[in-house]
Amino acid sequence: MKAPKSRLTKAQIVRTLKKQNETLNGYSVKRIGLFGSYARGEQTAKSDIDFLVEFERPTYDNFYGLCVFLEKLFKRKVEVITPIALDSIRVAEVARSIRDSVVYV
């Protein structure tokens, strides 16, 4: 009989990210926050992990490299958006909801 796959929690994500400070700095991360279903504690086995990331140097290499790193770290699909992308969301209520729910690490 297979053991059930452990369920990743908001607290585990935050703890894991705090331990990765040096690596995050290598991708020029100024600030990283968790939002979406994991931040609300409503995740399912199929949920991706949503991050709002502010970069010191917002380059393609830093953005893409961070996305790959986070997916390997958490063994799950991630969605990464930046404050600029958040500002471009046309539905103000959606952007406000994200801003209000972000759990910064």
Locations of the language-model features?
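Short beta-strand->loop micro-motif that forms the acidic, two-metal-ion catalytic signature
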Residues: 50-53
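Conserved histidines in hydrophobic membrane contexts and catalytic metal-binding motifs
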Residues: 34
